[in-house]
């Protein structure tokens, strides 16, 4: 009988050891899973902190730039203001001519209609000249003074928007702010993007958020 009892005790010890091994394995798996979850949460927090730091840096840079612009307004005297004023004067005169023609009488003959149409077309051409000159002179000034066009770059990563790189496409949020697709993806959680500027939510549709084609084509 003694050998049987000894064998039974050994079997019980073996079962107890195996049970402890299984418990230890489950505990190790649980610890590993918790470590992975903790690592994921830490990475998410680090990404959020990085984005917040980038936003703070962006706002600081914009504040410094606005102060610089206020202090350097005198530089605009180098722009050929006379050329702009001359074109604007032509535009005003064209508008006055049309207003005067409308006061005198409605066009009753093909010739009068043609004259009025030509006056209107000339006014449109003058307006476009003013617009083109304004834009060209502004670009010259910005280039000369080494001022960046902030709206051409993502406000978070400061990368310039790209037509070819999909990650740098400008994406429009519901609140109207633009960010690159890469930063949008980092900010997206549970299908919702929270704007870092006004904290408004934008739900990501199945087809994705719309691109700002106007910024891409500039």
From Swiss-Prot:
Gene3D superfamilies: Zinc/RING finger domain, C3HC4 (zinc finger). Coiled coil: none annotated. PROSITE patterns: ZF_RING_1, ZF_RING_2. A zinc finger (RING-type) spans 154-199. It comes from Caenorhabditis elegans. This is Uncharacterized RING finger protein B0416.4. SUPFAM superfamilies: RING/U-box. It comes from the Eukaryota. Keywords: Metal-binding, Zinc, Zinc-finger. The keyword Cell inner membrane does not apply. It holds the Pfam family zf-RING_UBOX.
């Amino acid at each position: 009988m003694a050998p049987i009892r000894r064998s039974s005790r050994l079997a019980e010890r073996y079962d107890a050891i195996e049970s402890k091994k299984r418990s230890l394995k489950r505990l190790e798996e649980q610890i590993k899973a918790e470590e992975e979850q903790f690592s994921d949460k830490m990475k998410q927090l680090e990404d959020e902190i990085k984005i917040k730091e980038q936003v703070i840096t962006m706002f600081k840079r914009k504040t410094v730039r606005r102060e610089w612009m206020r202090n350097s307004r005198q530089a605009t005297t180098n722009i050929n203001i006379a050329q702009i004023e001359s074109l604007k004067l032509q535009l005003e005169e064209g508008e006055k001519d049309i207003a005067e023609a409308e006061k005198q009488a409605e066009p009753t003959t093909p010739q009068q209609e043609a004259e009025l149409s030509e006056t209107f077309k000339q006014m449109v051409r003058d307006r476009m000249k003013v617009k083109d000159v304004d834009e060209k002179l502004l670009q010259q000034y910005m280039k000369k003074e080494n001022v960046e066009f902030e709206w051409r770059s993502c406000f978070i990563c400061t990368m310039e928007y790209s037509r070819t790189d999909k990650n740098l496409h400008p994406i429009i949020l519901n609140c109207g702010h633009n960010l690159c697709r890469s930063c949008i993806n980092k900010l997206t959680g549970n299908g919702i993007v929270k704007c870092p500027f006004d904290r408004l939510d934008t739900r990501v549709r199945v087809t994705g958020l719309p691109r700002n084609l106007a910024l891409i084509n500039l």
